[in-house]
């Protein structure tokens, strides 16, 4: 029964010592975390120097501290990579966005700049092909054909018939004028001949 107070006292002292040691180790670990940005690998602390030898409880505390140190090393080594990967992802997204903006440009400005000869190019997204809006007087896929003006057949027919009628009328008028002149000359010549014959007859009678 006298041994029980001494055993309890020893256990209490061991617990106090372990608490002090763990407090110092945690303080050092916090300092290491504060300096972890400049030096990602924290200095290794030997648990043999921190904890006194002896007892299964001290060994358990030592194992827990080593496990905590390993976890801290893993977190410190993984934090810079975790910080670096989002930057890479953001940079990749920016590049993809830049490529997307380039794809949205009008292909008629660069690729199909000289596609339409006599017209304006217009890219049809549904067909994924360019089309041309031709200037007046041109036709074709690339506005390369010259379209001649088409005359109205009815108009040309009326025009030719009018010209033919005018020509016939003018020719008939000319013929009538010529016939009239010939008839006038013939009648005048016939009257002159009759007068001459009468004069000849009168002269012959006077001579008898």
Swiss-Prot record:
Q: How is this protein named in the record?
A: Proheparin-binding EGF-like growth factor
Region forming the signal peptide? 1-19
| Residue ranges annotated as Extracellular topological domain | 20-160
| Known partners and oligomeric status | Interacts with FBLN1. Interacts with EGFR and ERBB4.
Q: Where is this region: Disordered?
A: 33-56, 82-104
Glycosylated residues in this chain: 37-38, 44, 47, 75, 85
Q: Where do transmembrane segments lie in this chain?
A: 161-184
Keywords per UniProt = Cell membrane, Disulfide bond, EGF-like domain, Glycoprotein, Growth factor, Heparin-binding, Membrane, Receptor, Secreted, Signal, Transmembrane, Transmembrane helix
Assigned GO CC terms = cell surface; clathrin-coated endocytic vesicle membrane; endocytic vesicle membrane; extracellular region; extracellular space; plasma membrane
Site residues (Plays a critical role in diphtheria toxin binding and toxin sensitivity), renumbered to this chain: 141
Q: Which residues form the EGF-like domain?
A: 104-144
Q: Which organism is it from?
A: Homo sapiens
Q: What cystine pairs are annotated? A: 108-121, 116-132, 134-143
